[in-house]
């Protein structure tokens, strides 16, 4: 009988300790799924190059000459956003804001802008800001708010440079994932 009690006690303690160790492990967090997800293309034509009439952005300050990476240059833009890569497609929104080059030893810009939607599909705005590490293939900026169809939205915009034609034109694929939708 004493042998059975010892075996039972040992088994009981073993099970309690095993349960404690298992429950002490942190559960793995699964990635939340976006409540809205869509892709847009950002088209930028710089002022002062070949296509002045169709320019959608202009430098309002020039770099002061501190390096070879445009450090200090400030650009204001009002760029069309399309659902495909074609610049001639009907814009579904306008990206209105600015970016400035903020790194002396590599290309890097800091963006702050509003996507202004006025289409049959969406009405309202999304506010986006953050660092664009241009030399990285895929980079994320923050969606920090919105209005209308995007009231108080938050999320991530993943940038991928799709086309780059020097100081003339560039196109960025923007994968917009909203995680807070009201």
Swiss-Prot record:
Expressing tissues: Confined to shoot meristem, vascular region of cotyledons and siliques abscission zone.
Highest taxon, organism lineage: Eukaryota
UniProt xrefs under Gene3D superfamilies: Allene oxide cyclase-like
Pfam families cross-referenced by the UniProt entry: Dirigent
Cysteine-cysteine disulfides: 35-181
InterPro entries: Allene_oxi_cyc_Dirigent (IPR044859), Dirigent (IPR004265)
Protein's GO biological process: (-)-pinoresinol biosynthetic process
Signal peptide, first to last residue: 1-23
Keyword list, A-Z: Apoplast, Disulfide bond, Glycoprotein, Secreted, Signal
Cellular localization per UniProt: Secreted, Extracellular space, Apoplast
One MF term in the entry's GO annotations: guiding stereospecific synthesis activity
Cellular component per GO, a single term: apoplast
Glycan attachment positions: 54, 118
Similarity comment text for this entry: Belongs to the plant dirigent protein family.
PANTHER family: DIRIGENT PROTEIN, DIRIGENT PROTEIN 5
Subunit field text: Homodimer.
Biological role stated in the UniProt entry: Dirigent proteins impart stereoselectivity on the phenoxy radical-coupling reaction, yielding optically active lignans from two molecules of coniferyl alcohol in the biosynthesis of lignans, flavonolignans, and alkaloids and thus plays a central role in plant secondary metabolism. Enantiocomplementary dirigent protein that mediates the laccase-catalyzed enantioselective oxidative phenol coupling of (E)-coniferyl alcohol to (-)-pinoresinol.
Name of the molecule in the record: Dirigent protein 5
Organism: Arabidopsis thaliana (Mouse-ear cress)
Species classification: Eukaryota, Viridiplantae, Streptophyta, Embryophyta, Tracheophyta
